[in-house]
Amino acid sequence: MTTDRTTQYALDVLADKIVAGDLVKAACQRHIDDMKAAEAAPYRYYFDVEEAERIIDFAETLTIAEGEEEQPVTAYPFQCFILGSLNGWRTKDGHHRRFRTSYIQLGRQNGKSFLNGILAAYYGNFDKYKYGQVYCTATKKDQAMIVFNEIVKFINSDSDLSECFKIHEHNSTIDCKITHSKIKALSGDTKSIDGFRPYLGIVDEYHAHKDDQMYKLLE
């Protein structure tokens, strides 16, 4: 029997095949426990394997442009767990995503901005939501541009993908042609997004923010 990649990571962590900390183990245990609970009618949520695999498959169509030679993306098991959990868990009533907020903490050079770039590109153009707004934010514009530039690299390294987006570097905006959504990089000037309703808000380097005002505006 083949197990989906999200669940396989959880099983491997709980079997000590993958070294992980207590919080990761708790998230994996929750995943397994909730899959069992989902079999009962009163439980509000279920795990949609197709939706989980869909975003992981999307990630693996992308190209890593940085370096001497371009390489196809191969998602690591922990990345599969993050992506699959966020997109796969759904409400039984309405098929809405279960998780509206996530906190992802990774060590330096472990692909945090890369992962955020995947989420922004996917939810910007391939999630069927029309006229959405996706914000890549940080305390400073240079930091916000790191995630934005990850998306730009994905687009520029793939001729098919480049047909689906239009990049406006002068104002740090990407038009999503399929959904008519926009992806935009913003700095800690919170007034610039006050009143907007983001479909996806990414707060990069959250620990560097002096308060949670940006997070609250994106909620």
Functional labels for PLM-detected ranges:
Residues 2-219:
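Phosphate/NTP-binding elements of NTP-utilizing enzymes
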